[in-house]
Every structure is written in structure tokens, then in C-alpha cells.
From Swiss-Prot:
It comes from Saccharomyces cerevisiae (strain ATCC 204508 / S288c). Present with 3510 molecules/cell in log phase SD medium. InterPro entries: AFUB_07903/YDR124W-like_hel (IPR047092), AFUB_079030/YDR124W-like (IPR021264), YDR124W_N (IPR048462). Residues 270-286 have a biased composition (Basic and acidic residues). This is Uncharacterized protein YDR124W. It comes from the Eukaryota. Pfam families: AFUB_07903_YDR124W_hel (PF11001), YDR124W_N (PF21652).
Amino acid sequence: MRIGMEELRRALALLNGQGYEFMVFIKEKDHLISESIPKNLFSESFISSSIEKNPPLTFDPLVNRKRITVYEENIQPAIMLPLDQPLLIQNYLYTAFKLLRQVPCKAIAKLWIKIIEPRKKTRFPYIKGNAGRPEWWPKDVEHKEPDHLQKADRLKLMCTIIMNVLPQSPFSLEILDELTGVTAAMTIFKKETVKKVIMKNVFEIAKCLCNKDFKQKTISLDDLNDLAQKQKKSYHSRRFDVNKMVKVEKDLLQQSSGSDSSPSMILPSKESDTEYFPREYPKDPVSEDYSNSISRLENLVEFDPLFLTKLDELTSSDDCKDFI
């Protein structure tokens, strides 16, 4: 019953964030009337922010005022992710990385590998293929530069780093702090707020998995359904801005026709997101005897209805419309 109620609350929060109006009354299966509780028809109620901030007194016969939830405006829907279920964690991470799009994921994966395996180029060169991969590298992922991997393999590699490699390292929290800092400094996260929020949730998961003293069984994270919708709106908004810029440029060209001057275009300097030289640790942060069979990622699911609606309905092909 409680699981069903959590799903209902999350769905209503998502609808509220999208501007829907609703008033929902719930009567529990074993709703009992006691002397301490007024004789109400329903045990709980949920009201959207757009209907009314303060429920009127006419609600009193229907539900106890203390059991009325009024959703705030612009509330960020959240989900509770169980930390003792690796498949659900893997699914959330996989979907989060997919929402980032693949150009950013290529840069992030290369940066992470430089930090967790500082001397990889000399000890585990890509030129040796699968025979030269480190112990922590997923067995079912080819040993290639992240740029050259298939999308599914690249996302699987990133999930492995968060779920397996970092928690197994003797310097997990120190390395995680370094990963968090250098990732946040990448240009992509300065331009797009939604992607920054997505990575914040990814690192929250990593922090819980790396912290041996963390006793909670669940963690509250932003609902990827809502973030996907916001990213879709942001993408269409920026595409509209680009179209306006093109129109302005055409107008300027028409105005300047017949003159010697022409509008100049200032091209931004290309910033490298992968040129980073990690600090050395007293010993290799990734243990040599790391067993890849532990928590091996298998049977990846692209999305889970608890977390994300089908991405094909929200965006077009990842391969054709990657953007930074």
C-alpha cells in the first residue's frame, strides 16, 4: 500500500509541475474512525497549487485538515531510490547518462578514466585491445576510447565506474570529490542547468555507495521524468533562439549589401573538457585484485516506468542531435 501511495504522490507532483489542476481524495482500505479523529469520509487528500493555497472549511466533512497536502508551485518531483537494489540504481544511472546526451558523456567518461586510472596510457593502453584492459573494466565492454564505444557500452562503462569502481577503491571519497569538482567545471554544466542537476543526482548516489557509514536504505533523488521534460523545453527554446539569430544575421547582411563592411562573427574559443592531469595517490586508487565479477552490470534496461517515460517520445535520436 505504501509503495502505491509513493507512486501516486510522485505522479501528482509531476502533474502539478506541468500546470495540471487536481483535487484527489483517498480512502484507505482499512480506514477506521476513532474518537481522536473526526468522522471524515476520506483519510487523505491532495490538491494542486493552482486550485487553492488554503483549503476552505467546506473540506472538513470530507477529510481531516491535517491530512490535506497542497502542492507548492514549481516543486521538484522526487523519488526514493532503494540503495539495496543494484538493478534500480543501475537503471537510474543509465537513464540519467542517456539524458545528458552522448557528446557530453564521451568527454565525462574520458575525464573520469584519467582520474581513477592516472597511468592508464602506459599500463593499460587502448592499442592492446581487450588483452590490455584493467581489471575494473567491464568484461562485456570493448576496451576502446569512450569516443569509439557504442552508446550502450559507453553508458555501461560510466555506470560501472559509479557503482563498482569508486566504492571498491581505498580512496573512494577522495576520488569522488575530485571527480565531482572537475566534472562540475566542464563547460557543458555552465550552460545547461538541467544537465547540472542530473549530475548532482548521479554524484549523490556515488556518495552514498562510497560512504561506508551511510546507514539509510533509500535516498531521495530528482525524478528523471520531470528533468526530461525540462530538458525538452530547454532544447526547443534554444533552437528557437538560434533561428532568431539566423534571421538577425540575414537582416544585417541585407542591410550591408553594396558596402565594403560585413557583419563579423566572433567564434568562441574551443575549451577542452578533457585536458586534465589528475593528482597521484599513494598507491593505485583501483585495487589490482579487483574482481570484475562483483556487481557486474548485466541486462541493462533503458528505462523504468518508475523513473522515466519512453525517451523516444521526448527527444529524437541521440546520435543525430547531440548537443553541448
